[in-house]
A protein has these predicted regions:
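Amphipathic alpha-helical interface elements
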Residues: 1-232
Length: 232
């Protein structure tokens, strides 16, 4: 495809950043755009796998401590999320629960699946972590031990999940992940850092990510191709 057509389809404003990053080379700009799409697909797939595994691990832990219907029970009268501090979670759960009940489709599993990444992240924030019994660090059996210099506590996990969620949302909103911050400079440093965070959390969860993502994970290869497009 000619660059003029490519630019018309995706907009001058969007493509100008790619062309600047490639030193004005329009052919390389189109290649960079395509590589960014492929990298976004890869990262989103890995985050999706991570989200499902995290969700299931959290559920298994809370079923064992709070009961088989812990999520629904949290928004029943006098439920643990019936507090002003957890109003957003209460609303999310209640909305999904009511919709499923109206459709005659309610199951605990379907209610779990209706919660977004942000919900699972916030279970590690101080209030939700305490209200669910302060047990959720147990989903990371291989977590590093805290030291006086570094506390690998629920706040640490929350912050790591927040960064992963931010990356997920960037991709979902079609924002590029192949640049340095907001500049028109090719860089895969940030996306590789977030990728390593996910790999580390998989390790802490006792998940063999290499076997899990066999045939799916080509992140480093794509990052290398992207970096080769940097102007000399």
């Amino acid at each position: 495809m000619r660059y003029n057509t490519f630019e018309r389809l995706f907009s001058h404003e969007r493509m100008d950043r790619y062309r600047q990053a490639c030193g004005g080379d329009s052919r390389k700009a189109m290649t960079l755009y395509r590589y960014n799409l492929l990298l976004s697909q890869q990262i989103f797939t890995i985050i999706s796998c991570f989200e499902v595994i995290l969700r299931n691990a959290i559920d298994a832990k809370l079923v064992s401590t709070l009961g088989n219907e812990w999520l629904k029970d949290a928004v029943m009268p006098r439920g643990r999320f019936c507090t002003p501090a957890t109003q957003k979670d209460f609303n999310s759960i209640s909305r999904s629960y009511n919709n499923l009940m109206t459709e005659g489709q309610y199951t605990h599993t379907k209610l779990l699946a209706s919660m977004d990444f942000g919900f699972w992240k916030y279970l590690f924030s101080p209030t939700q972590f305490r209200l669910t019994g302060s047990v959720l660090l147990g989903v990371f059996p291989n977590k590093e031990r805290s030291t006086p210099e570094m506390q690998y506590n629920h706040s640490y996990i929350f912050n790591e999940l927040d960064k992963i969620n931010t990356m997920r949302n960037r991709i979902a909103h079609h924002e590029p992940i192949c640049f340095f911050l907001q500049d028109s400079v090719i860089s895969t440093t940030h996306v590789l850092n977030e990728y390593q965070k996910i790999q580390r959390l998989f390790l802490w969860m006792d998940v063999d990510s290499r076997a899990l993502l066999y045939g799916l994970d080509h992140v480093q290869e794509l990052c290398n191709k992207i970096n080769e497009l940097k102007p000399i």
